[in-house]
């Protein structure tokens, strides 16, 4: 439905849409899944939750067809009804939100008075250590997400405790992501996640929130380490976002689709012959050697430029 222009227009005309990746933010997913279960008696995905500006849910549901059918309300009808009710019958919305708050107060909305303990922070560090990929960086196996919030936590943990392992996990991950195919070495910017453990083959979609959070992670790492590589990546991400994701009105697009020319990633992959025709023999030799571009390719007969097997001291 996100790709349906008619539905997208309905949503954008009547609501502010926020898309959350439940694989990257299972904590957010868990909260609103409880909302859906409490309101409907069941949950599932895809999950849609409609909220007031102060973030109190007043409607939740899972799958909606485009038009109403087989007893299921269509997403267009749901959007229209909720928008009309919100504007014309605010008392009904208020009654629902009050009921939701009372029902969920104990499990979601109640603010805890206890501070996060040192033991809890240490435990979080140890849990990340258990899942850390010492060979390629990152956490757990494929598909592998950047999870910049983990890296920012580890940077702060290192600053407070001096535990070198925390810093090493961050640096290994940042280096591997920026050298791999997860990063666009031509147009810059990070793709959404890697389909393999070594960050080579990405899902080619580029998300605005990934650029923002990874920019924070790389700039904070630069501040801590003084590593110019992190500064370069940060500057390139800013350049990419301003060039490709800023709208003419001055706002930002939320994502760039993975598909082009009828298939995923076609825009981002290269044949060795293409590189040679564009750059000429001398420059092409340097580029293909540096970015591991071969005749056989590393992705469906084409190449995802990467620096995985390249040592920086040989590039300059």
What do the predicted segments below correspond to?
Residues 1-316:
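Replace the tail clause
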């Amino acid at each position: 439905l996100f790709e349906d222009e008619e539905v997208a227009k309905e949503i954008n005309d009547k609501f502010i849409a926020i898309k959350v990746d439940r694989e990257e933010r299972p904590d957010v997913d868990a909260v609103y899944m409880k909302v859906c279960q409490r309101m409907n008696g069941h949950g599932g995905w895809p999950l849609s939750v409609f909220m007031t500006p102060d973030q109190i849910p007043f409607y939740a549901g899972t799958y909606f067809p485009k038009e109403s059918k087989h007893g299921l309300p269509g997403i267009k009808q749901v959007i229209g009804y909720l928008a009309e009710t919100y504007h014309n019958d605010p008392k009904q919305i208020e009654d629902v939100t009050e009921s939701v708050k009372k029902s969920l107060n104990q499990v979601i909305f109640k603010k805890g008075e206890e501070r996060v303990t040192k033991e809890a922070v240490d435990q979080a560090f140890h849990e990340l250590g258990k899942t850390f990929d010492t060979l390629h960086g990152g956490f757990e196996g494929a598909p592998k997400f950047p999870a910049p919030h983990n890296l920012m936590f580890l940077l702060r943990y290192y600053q407070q405790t001096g535990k070198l392992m925390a810093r090493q996990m961050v640096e290994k991950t940042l280096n591997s992501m920026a050298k791999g195919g997860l990063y666009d070495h031509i147009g810059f910017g990070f793709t959404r996640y890697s389909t393999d453990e070594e960050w080579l083959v990405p899902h080619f979609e580029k998300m605005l929130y990934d650029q923002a959070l990874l920019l924070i992670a790389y700039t904070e790492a630069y501040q801590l380490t003084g590593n110019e590589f992190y500064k370069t990546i940060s500057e390139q991400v800013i350049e990419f976002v301003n060039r490709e994701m800023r709208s003419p009105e001055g706002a930002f697009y939320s994502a760039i689709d993975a598909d082009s020319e009828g298939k995923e990633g076609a825009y981002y992959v290269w044949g060795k012959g293409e590189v040679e025709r564009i750059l000429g023999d001398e420059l092409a030799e340097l580029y293909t050697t540096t970015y591991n571009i071969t005749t056989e390719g590393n992705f469906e007969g084409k190449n995802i430029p990467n620096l995985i097997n390249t040592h920086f001291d040989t590039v300059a």
